[in-house]
Amino acid sequence: MKRTKRIIDIGIIALLVVAAIGLLAFSWGGGKPNDLSIPVGSFEFTDQDGGQVGLDDLKGKVWVAHFMFTNCSTVCPTLTANMAKLQSEIKSAGLKADLVSFSVDPEKDTPEALKTYIGKFTDDLSNWHALTGYSFEDIQAFGQLSFKTAIQKDAIGDQVIHGISFYLVDASGTIVTKYDGQDPPYSQIIKHIKALSR
């Protein structure tokens, strides 16, 4: 009886030790985020330089995506400024990750308009792809299918209603987690990018 109890106690202690090690590994950035597992659908859109950027071009890279438009009078300036700060944090950490901004107002957001807009927030567009070159219906369907986010036109104005999340995508093109784009947890995002880059 005592022997059986001792074996059970040892088993419980072993499980607790394993759990503690796992928790520490994740907190140190060793754990890869996996609360989402959504494959991004295939795409090939036009970037701010007039070139084509698609899912195949991003394969093998870690990237962070969000939705925006240049005529946005509400959340987009904050989201884009926060994405620019994330770009700076990524560089400071010595990491590599691409940033992808999908326009939800492609009829107005030409490549030139996107380049001018993003240029207000950063001088470095080398790893930032601001994308357009599709119909509103296309980006609406793409957002819903690939990012599980709703995109719709404002019935009484020229604004577009869209989500405010930043999406972290791994090298295989799978969304692994998302963050509040209005108040990003920069240190956590950096840890996650580091974990995915190993």
Model-assigned labels for residue ranges:
Residues 43-62, 87:
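A short beta-strand-turn-helix
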Residues 55-77, 83:
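Short active-site neighborhood of thiol/selenol oxidoreductases, capturing the structured segment around
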Residues 128, 140, 144-152, 160-167:
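Structural micro-motif
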Residues 1-46, 196-198:
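N-terminal targeting signals for export/organelle localization
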Residues 40-41, 62-63, 163-165:
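Short loop/turn microsegments at loop-to-beta-strand junctions
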Residues 80-142:
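Structural microenvironment flanking redox-active thiols in thiol-disulfide oxidoreductases
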Residues 153-198:
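Thiol-/selenol-based redox modules, centered on thioredoxin-like
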